[in-house]
Amino acid sequence: MNCLLLGRGFLHRFHPFRPVLCEDSASAATTITSQFKLNYRQIFIGSSLGLAAGFALGKLGRLFIVACSAVFATIAYINSKGLIRINWPQLQQQVIGPTEQYTGFHFPSSGRFNTQSTFPTIRNWICTNPNFKLSFFSAMYVGFVSS
């Protein structure tokens, strides 16, 4: 008899698959922010990932430098013993030619850079999600220096 009096709409409120929200609690989708509009979740994730990436980059970077130096020293040693011949002028021309092409100040036909399309994209990249980016890059620097 009570089920008839309560009605279907009233019982629907107590259905077990309906999400329960308290008046003073935030939903899971709500971002946690302070009065300064800082997203603490993004800051935490950015700093954690940045620290790990910086530490790994520092360790792997040193390993990469040591490996490249060992390969270069081995090639130079084998070349000095006469087992292989390296045409250094041709190699230098092949490496430096493309480098000068990309690092030289070759302006487009208009005589200046296209800054109108460059600066808005840089500004948009910096301004979107700054909490994550600032914490990521600062923690990456700390991880890189401490490795």
Swiss-Prot record:
It is found in: Membrane. The chain crosses the membrane at residues 63-79. The keyword Membrane applies. Coiled coil: none annotated. Its main location: membrane. InterPro entries: FUN14 (IPR007014). GO terms for cellular component: mitochondrial outer membrane; mitochondrion. It is a single-pass membrane protein. One of its GO terms (biological process) is autophagy of mitochondrion. The keyword Ribosomal protein does not apply. Keywords: Membrane, Transmembrane, Transmembrane helix. It comes from the Eukaryota. Belongs to the FUN14 family. This is Uncharacterized protein C29A4.17c.
